[in-house]
Amino acid sequence: MADSAQVPTLVYLVTGGCGFLGEHIVRMLLEREPRLRELRVFDLHLSSWLEELKAGPVQVTAIQGDVTQAHEVAAAMSGSHVVIHTAGLVDVFGKASPKTIHKVNVQGTQNVIDACVQTGTQYLVYTSSMEVVGPNIKGHPFYRGNEDTPYEAVHSHPYPCSKALAEQLVLEANGRKVNGGLPLVTCALRPTGIYGEGHQVMRDFYYQGLRFGGRLFRAVPASVEHGRVYVGNVAWMHILVARELEQRAALMGGQVYFCYDKSPYKSYEDFNMEFLSPCGLRLIGAHPLLPYWLLVLLATLNALLQWLLRPLVLYTPLLNPYTLAMANTTFTVSTNKAQRHFGYKPLFSWEESRTRTIQWVQAMEGSAR
């Protein structure tokens, strides 16, 4: 790829390109990858904003398809140089069955790998998750850890299990011969909690606060820190990895990287208030309003109700044993591996990330300001 610098000859495929992260990757590729000739956006549901991108100098090809269908993935990939595989089913609330989560996240990833081999596509970047590592079901904290920090990654929930299996498939595929005899070069990126424009959970918290008269109620101790990362910096890291994989294949191939930036370490709720407070919302309580034992009881009851009601109705409460453990377990990352391996530096400062996210929240219909 290096010989074609500044010459628009490359074809990229982005799976899940209409999702939260996928959209940011697509838009940033068009802005910051001068070698791009064609950008293929593959998703189960295509978004209307894709049409506005087709007026630019890069050919944007929208492909409606399903990663669980191997022939659709292979057809979309044929002739591509690089694949950024961000398609996946993110579900920690029980909206999808464990079988469906596995089919999309694990079998879908296997289909992408097989399509790389079949079509001779040599470079694969996979969007993994911090949840491949933790927090684990035992509630062990991960404090300022990096990619080599020992940690007991024990999961029982279908989502982190599926992401761990998919990541393993991607890393094990590194070096596999693709059609034409060249080696497949793969790596995986593990974002911590992503935030920014388009984040559905942030949107849900905002409207929840509006329904409660501009108030949110503390449920997690302020001392429980979480690592968060701005979506624009996650997208930027994906683009840098895709750009550098050829020249640094021996170093980067088969590697995992946490996605990180300069966002501050705070509790999940206190971090969200960095954006929601300027939009008129208040967080009530210096300490959790309900004792932890009661939250555990409620989460367990919700899980039981979900199991009992499953034959009749889909019951998907926000509070369940997994989400409670996630919210109440410190998980923060401190690493410079991406900088050392391929020169990553955050494209957006914390101040820029915060401002852009606040402006997005303020633009929502029904703003409390």
From Swiss-Prot:
Which residues does UniProt mark as catalytic?
Answer: 159
Biological process terms in GO annotation:
B cell chemotaxis; steroid biosynthetic process
A Pfam family matched in the record? 3Beta_HSD
Annotated positions binding NAD(+): 163
Q: Specify the pathway.
A: Lipid metabolism; steroid biosynthesis
Subcellular location per the Swiss-Prot or TrEMBL entry: Endoplasmic reticulum membrane
The answer to keyword Endoplasmic reticulum applying to this record is: yes
The way it spans or sits in the membrane comes to: Multi-pass membrane protein
Cellular component (GO) terms are: endoplasmic reticulum membrane; lipid droplet
Q: In which tissues is it expressed?
A: Predominantly expressed in liver.
On the tree of life, the source organism's domain of life is Eukaryota
Keyword annotations of the record: Endoplasmic reticulum, Lipid metabolism, Membrane, NAD, Oxidoreductase, Steroidogenesis, Transmembrane, Transmembrane helix
EC number, UniProt record: 1.1.1.-, 1.1.1.181
Q: Where are the transmembrane segments?
A: 289-309, 312-334
The Gene Ontology terms for molecular function here are: cholest-5-ene-3-beta,7-alpha-diol 3-beta-dehydrogenase activity
Does Magnesium appear among the keywords?
no
Catalytic reaction list: 7alpha-hydroxycholesterol + NAD(+) = 7alpha-hydroxycholest-4-en-3-one + NADH + H(+); 7alpha,25-dihydroxycholesterol + NAD(+) = 7alpha,25-dihydroxy-4-cholesten-3-one + NADH + H(+); (25R)-cholest-5-en-3beta,7alpha,26-triol + NAD(+) = (25R)-7alpha,26-dihydroxycholest-4-en-3-one + NADH + H(+); (24S)-7alpha-dihydroxycholesterol + NAD(+) = (24S)-7alpha,24-dihydroxycholest-4-en-3-one + NADH + H(+)
Top-rank EC class of the record's enzyme:
oxidoreductase
Explain the purpose of this protein: The 3-beta-HSD enzymatic system plays a crucial role in the biosynthesis of all classes of hormonal steroids. HSD VII is active against four 7-alpha-hydroxylated sterols. Does not metabolize several different C(19/21) steroids as substrates. Involved in bile acid synthesis. Plays a key role in cell positioning and movement in lymphoid tissues by mediating degradation of 7-alpha,25-dihydroxycholesterol (7-alpha,25-OHC): 7-alpha,25-OHC acts as a ligand for the G protein-coupled receptor GPR183/EBI2, a chemotactic receptor for a number of lymphoid cells.
- Which family does the similarity line name? Belongs to the 3-beta-HSD family.
State the name under which the record lists this protein: 3 beta-hydroxysteroid dehydrogenase type 7
Q: Which organism is it from?
A: Mus musculus
